[in-house]
Structure formats: C-alpha cells, structure tokens
Amino acid sequence: MTPPTASFINPATAGPQPGSFKLSKGSLHACSTTAAPKYEQYVPIKTGEEPIEDFNGHYRFAEIKESHTSRAMTARYMADMMDAAVSDVVIIGAGSAGLTCAYTLAKQRPDLRITMLEASVAPGGGAWLGGQLMSGMVIRKPAHNLLVEIGVPFDDEGSYVVVKHAALFTSTLMSKLLAMDNVKLFNATCCEDLIIKKDQTGAQRVNGVVTNWTLVTMAHGLQSCMDPQTITAPVVIGACGHDGPFGAFSVKRLSSAGLIKLGDMRPMDMNKSEGLIVNNTREVFPGLIVSGMELSEHDGHPRMGASFGGMIGSGQKAAYEAIKLYDSLEIDDGEVVGLKH
C-alpha cells in the first residue's frame, strides 16, 4: 500500500489555477481572504511585433509589462509556499550532503513531497570549490558512482577521482534535482527553529521547521516583531554542515533546548572521518535525521577536509533512512499520529 503523502495541489487535477483569469475591477476588495485574486498571465504576441533573433542589430523581444513579471514570480512562489506548508520530508541545507540526499530521495520515492531550505542565495554550500578556494573536487571511491549516474566526468586516480571543477558536480546535480516534480527548493530561506511536539507516547518529536527569509533573520537585531512561517513535516533532515553562522543548526537548536548533548567536531582525520559520517548517519532525535558535517558536531567525529565522498555517501544514507522512517509512521496531514505495526 502506498503511504499517505502530504496534501500538495496537483495542477493537472486541481482545476483553474491562479493566473488563469483576468483580474476584474474591484475584485481585490471583493475576493475571499482564503483565495488569491485571479489575473490574465498569458500575453499573446501581436502581429507585427513578433520576436526576432537577429544579432545584426535587429534583435527584438516579445512585449511584456513589468506587472507580468511581478505576477509571474509571485504567483508561483506563493503557490510553492502553500504547497510546502505540509511536506513529507524537509531537508535543511542544500550543500553536497543535502543535495545528494534530496536527489536520492526524490528519485527513489517520487510519491514523497520534498522541501529544501537553503540560507544562502546560492545553493551548494561549500561544494562550489575544493579546498582552500581551489577548483578541483576530490571524491573517494565508491562515492564516485553518483558522478557516473548523473554524468559528471572525472579523472580516475585509483582510490579516488577528481572532478576538474567542483561547480561542475554541484550544478549538474542541482539541474537534475530541480527538474523533479516532487522537489521544492527555497533558497535565501533559513530555518529559525524546529517544531517539536509530543507524540502519541508522550515523547518529544520533531514535526517540522520554522522558517524565515535569511535577510529577515539577519535583521532581527535591527527590527522587532518579524515573525516566521512554518512547514509541517513528519521527517526532517539536518544537513547544515559544521558549526558556522547557520551551520549545524538542527543539533545546536536541540542542544540549546536541553534535548541533546553535542559531541563537537574533532580535528581532521580524513580516512577515519568519512566512513564514520556515512555509517552513523541516522535519526538522532525522534523525527530528525542528521547527515554530513552536521553529524560530526553531534557525534564528535573528526573533520574530513576537502574530500567530498563522505558528504555524498551520507546524503544517500540519509535518504534511505528517511524512507524507512517515513514508512514506519502513521501520518495525518503531515503530523505523526502513531507508528505502523
């Protein structure tokens, strides 16, 4: 039996969507507070004003108004926010571990709705460069199998491979991930808190995240009363990297709430670290799976430096752990109401 999924709108079956109809005069005041006004988003190309791709001084764009741009962006972003308000899995952090996790999870389970949060404008975390701002990306085997799968070329150096530029891996992975229908990415959006509730046994459980735009979060010391939003999800995955401005967020928040004790990341030992990170990727607190370097802050594993195999393997392991966890839960509209027997 297919497990229940979050109540996302299916554009193919939900009937007329925002943007299907022309906004009539006065309808902003007359419309319900629960429904967005409708508007005409399709702009027909007028005869005699057809776009021309001529680079000899006659290049001409199709006509558009500024309001078309604003409405096109706003309608889609707000529709995404409405859909993601109840998700099946939320991944905090879109670095190498988070992106790999989302790709693996979305591919394995297209029935699950996956929401990613990334505090930076540019997803990818530290995976745009190798070590010390150099371009090459080192990946130890067998994690290179993901490169083969997504079509990223590399130099085979025996026990490891080298991608000529880390950005090639990250951009390729993102292009495949974001093309998937069951994945939504909110970048420039950070996690400010976790939703923690008691489950049916009375135990504390992570059941979603509290979000805000990163620039708002950074301005909390300058302004007051800038409240966040929430995303409800039965499974949350922390992939925020090691300690930093937004790093290791999930485990640091649990620690500050007195719910766990951090192990703190140990000094570098590349050979030891990567295997420990992958093999120990798990649910560290009910409802929260932790992967990548965030796990090193929780468990006290050594740092691994500029070798990315551990991040890839940990992201994949987190995806498989998320599937097992999700399939073990009884879920009602994103909230855990029991365990399957």
Swiss-Prot record:
Entry's localization field: Cytoplasm; Nucleus
UniProt PTM comment: During the catalytic reaction, a sulfide is transferred from Cys-225 to a reaction intermediate, generating a dehydroalanine residue.
Main location: cytoplasm
2,3-didehydroalanine (Cys) sites (modified residues): C225
The organism's place on the tree of life at top rank: Eukaryota
InterPro entries the UniProt entry points to: FAD/NAD-bd_sf, Sti35, Thi4_fam
Key words of the record: Cytoplasm, Iron, Metal-binding, NAD, Nucleus, Thiamine biosynthesis, Transferase
Residues that, per the record, bind substrate: A97, E118, A119, G126, C191, D227, H242, M293, R303, M304, G305
Role summary: Involved in biosynthesis of the thiamine precursor thiazole. Catalyzes the conversion of NAD and glycine to adenosine diphosphate 5-(2-hydroxyethyl)-4-methylthiazole-2-carboxylic acid (ADT), an adenylated thiazole intermediate. The reaction includes an iron-dependent sulfide transfer from a conserved cysteine residue of the protein to a thiazole intermediate. The enzyme can only undergo a single turnover, which suggests it is a suicide enzyme. May have additional roles in adaptation to various stress conditions and in DNA damage tolerance.
Protein name: Thiamine thiazole synthase
